[in-house]
Amino acid sequence: MQYEDENGVNEPSRRRLLKGIGALALAGSCPVAHAQKTQSAPGTLSPDARNEKQPFYGEHQAGILTPQQAAMMLVAFDVLASDKADLERLFRLLTQRFAFLTQGGAAPETPNPRLPPLDSGILGGYIAPDNLTITLSVGHSLFDERFGLAPQMPKKLQKMTRFPNDSLDAALCHGDVLLQICANTQDTVIHALRDIIKHTPDLLSVRWKREGFISDHAARSKGKETPINLLGFKDGTANPDSQNDKLMQKVVWVTADQQEPAWTIGGSYQAVRLIQFRVEFWDRTPLKEQQTIFGRDKQTGAPLGMLHEHDVPDYASDPEGKVIALDSHIRLANPRTAESESSLMLRRGYSYSLGVTNSGQLDMGLLFVCYQHDLEKGFLTVQKRLNGEALEEYVKPIGGGYFFALSGVKDANDYLGSALLRV
């Protein structure tokens, strides 16, 4: 693996090479391919779930407050567009594809069998919506000199740098744009990705990809049941209520009073971390120690010393950490103080399983994704509190990046990123 230096890596030569490959692919001379390990598949939901549909048009993009679907994919791309007009063409094209794929319809028929088929065919003759959401975010690198967008960069957007416990692989970090693709079933997610790549060979090149899942019963609960991660603990118990609009305005969405560029209003900062678990080591760790590390009962999810998952721990009555250790994950992540209220964020994580590492260990972990109105007050502040926690012995962040999720598409005459590109 190629590892990141502390401040990340710059790859202009790679982008130029990929642009040339993309042009060949558009001409039908060279397919764009990126080798990846075989991904794990979540189970299937009921047939009725295929007809579930999320609205595409609105103030915010779907896939952020949407209750988690069972299947998910993160795909980062390098943008091959040559200028701002080309970038607008890309965003308009993505908007068109997202609108069709998320709402469903008949698969296009290929008029000439001597030409490549217009659709991959993996969903059959009808493309069901299947609760599909595709969320577009932009990375720090999109605001370099290529498109003249530097003055419009979100104020808190930055390149992800290494924390003390990180072991970042450069091939799994950053990206000009990121797609978070979620649906009830994995074949719908894969179909969406292939459709997008087919329509953008001269504009996008895959940088890295990871697929994730949560259990079907957690997905069917529509946010009422907390998913369990591959360490066996509930993941996201302390999430703020995504159905509380007033709270989401405070926690997730960029608002006019933040002195951000005007185009960012209605969008959200997105932090992505690919975290590898040392599951064999974890499975040989005593239950009591596991629970002490997290600060929760493994079966119920309740804070130690309490009965129910959503009971609020009373740290003031446990100042020495005799019940919930001072360095436990939940106590460090959210100390429940007046100051920590400003670091709330909405988590939307998924498990992943990739096979085995080069050393023969199971390659499993967490695709950590969170949204917040301020990256520094949210994820970065929380992660700094977590530096040195006991859990670090069992987890290793290996990739990801920081992005900005664009605001929504108003109507059929609008397109993703229009407010940014019209400045």
From Swiss-Prot:
Co-factor binding details: Binds 1 heme b (iron(II)-protoporphyrin IX) group non-covalently per subunit.
Record's family?
A: Belongs to the DyP-type peroxidase family. EfeB subfamily.
Keyword Disulfide bond annotated? no
Q: Name one GO molecular function term.
A: metal ion binding
Residues reported to bind heme b:
236-238, 329, 334-336, 347
The reaction(s) catalysed by this protein are:
heme b + 2 H(+) = protoporphyrin IX + Fe(2+)
Q: Which gene encodes it?
A: efeB
Return the EC number.
Answer: 4.98.1.1, 1.11.1.-
Protein name in UniProt: Deferrochelatase
**Needed co-factor(s):** heme b
Biological processes, Gene Ontology terms: iron import into cell
